[in-house]
Amino acid sequence: MEIVYVYLKKRSEFGKQCNFSDRQAELNIDILPNPELAALYVERNPVDTGIQCSASMSEHEANTERFEMESCGVNHVEGGWPKDVNPQELEQTIRFRKKVEKDENYINAVMQLGSIMEHCIKQNNAIDIYEEYFDDEEAVEVTEEAPSAKTINVFRDPQEIKRTATHLSWHPDGNRKLAVAYSCLKFQRAPMSMNYDSYIWDLENPNRPEIALKPLSPLVTLEYNPKDSHVLLGGCYNGQIACWDTRKGSLVAELSTIEFSHRDPVYGTIWLQSKTGTECFSASTDGQVMWWDIRKISEPIEVVIMDISRKEQLENALGAISLEFESTLPTKFMVGTEQGIVISCNRKAKTQAEKIVCTFYGHHGPIYALQRNPFYPKNFLTVGDWTARIWSEDSRESSIMWTKYHMAYLSDGAWSPVRPAVFFTTKMDGTLDIWDLVFKQCDPALSLKVCDDPLFCLRVQDNGCLIACGSELGTTTLLEVSSSLSTLQRNEKNIASSIFERETRREKILEARHREMRLKEKGKVEGKEDDQKEEEAALDLDELVGKAEEEFFEVIFSELKRKEAEALKKKPKPRKKSSVKVEAEEEVEENVGEEEEAGGIIGIDAVEDMSEEAGEEQEDVPT
């Protein structure tokens, strides 16, 4: 602060005005030192000197401007979408536009403003102010930052008995809060005194949770409502669906009945993009997918059984352990099962059997993560056993890309929301792997040891800068990745698209080749079977010939006996057989026996001729 003091004096009191001029320096007086006084000089040693040890203090004042902070809301209506219209739904936006364009007020306003804006529109069309004149020149290469990540905060389970952080969910407005579900998924190993609470954490206060959610059973999943940030949806360990409203407190606001709920833990819950913002669906290891409306959550709206044989039998259903839904594909959803099979379903199908569209086989164990690429929905990521795989809906027999088999089991995975070629995976050894397909495809671009405990789940923030990882002991670690991993690179979309298309074409070629090989093997097997059938047919022919011979001789002897019986009936008196006839019959029987032993065939005419000759001889003999 400047201090000014004004001195007042009359001009007459100033005296005569000085007139200065430049001149050479001159010596006026020179006093020489006195030698006698110099001889009396004695140096004193030691000398006592006073010193001020304390710091010099002075009074200072500063006047600063104070900024007062307060929270306030603004209701912006003009130019925005209504609350019941989802901007991401193309059909809803088109329907709303058509409705507005038919309004008379809108037509009159456009007609009045058209003449005013016509001049400005012509100016904009005359010159392209956004034209880039040096776009063809090569850009100067800028050194990119190396991939890195650092720990920002750690949120620990406040309970004494530690539980697993099973699921994470970011606050939809600003991502200022993080909801964490805690549970013990080890079968029949949960302690009797284990607490069931789950928490909502403020990112700036890791010491104490902001809100505690108190369910009747431990929560396995927990999701924020994207349209109402005060509402949360949870899936319980006992199969029930619970709903909270943070404005009403920590207790459950809505709860499904046990009779109409799942029979096993609910591993997946997702909100649907509806007008009301109250519809959701869930999946469980009991093999059922259920649709709910939280306004009437006592029983589900619809149930689909995950029976890939399409017989709708619950005992044959595959247990669902992960769930995927993309808002741009409102009729489709995908389910990852315990058996390592991905089931693609269509909710709007007419029958229950038609709702299961196709299946993808690729993992040896449960599929813990399933997510579509946010830029290319036809490609989706699955994480299970020791690998992470990338699939295409056009190639169903095998995945188009996959990681190598790791030494540790993989527990979760997710795509980056800002970069189409980046995804994240967590492992049971506490490691977070960040994969960049543009930079490197065989190994992760960054592998970070987050903690010593096994990592169980992860969730990426919407802007891609922050990653939350939950461990088996309930510790949630918040990580911040470098700008190179959270910023869209130049031409990355085109590069990622070309990579996916190239691998899809390669898999289609391999599938066609394998199909041809299978057909050839099938033809060889069928040829061998035909040869075996011919050999068996030849053997069967000999057996049939022998059987035919036996049946033929049986018919002959039965016919002979019948004729003899008829001949005896025609004769009035029985006559004694002559020795000649007896000898003839014995000769016939001997000849027939010899023919049977030799394998020959005797005709009926030959037998009749022999019997006639025997009759003639009998007539010649006198009685």
Swiss-Prot record:
The keyword Ligase does not apply. WD repeats lie at residues 214-254, 261-302, 362-401, 405-445, 450-489. Predominantly expressed in ovary, testis and lung. SMART domains: WD40. The keyword Repeat applies. GO terms for cellular component: 9+2 motile cilium; axonemal dynein complex; axoneme; cilium; cytoplasm; dynein axonemal particle; external side of plasma membrane; glial cell projection. Keywords: Cell projection, Cilium, Cilium biogenesis/degradation, Cytoplasm, Cytoskeleton, Dynein, Microtubule, Motor protein, Repeat, WD repeat. Residues 565-602 are annotated as: Disordered. It is found in: Cytoplasm, Cytoskeleton, Cilium axoneme; Dynein axonemal particle. GO terms for molecular function: microtubule motor activity. Residues 570-579 have a biased composition (Basic residues). GO terms for biological process: cilium assembly; cilium movement; determination of left/right symmetry; outer dynein arm assembly. Residues 584-598 have a biased composition (Acidic residues). Belongs to the dynein intermediate chain family. Consists of at least two heavy chains and a number of intermediate and light chains. Interacts with DNAAF2. Interacts with DNAAF6/PIH1D3. Interacts with HEATR2; probably involved in outer arm dynein assembly. Interacts with CFAP53. Part of the dynein complex of respiratory cilia. This is Dynein axonemal intermediate chain 2. It comes from Mus musculus.
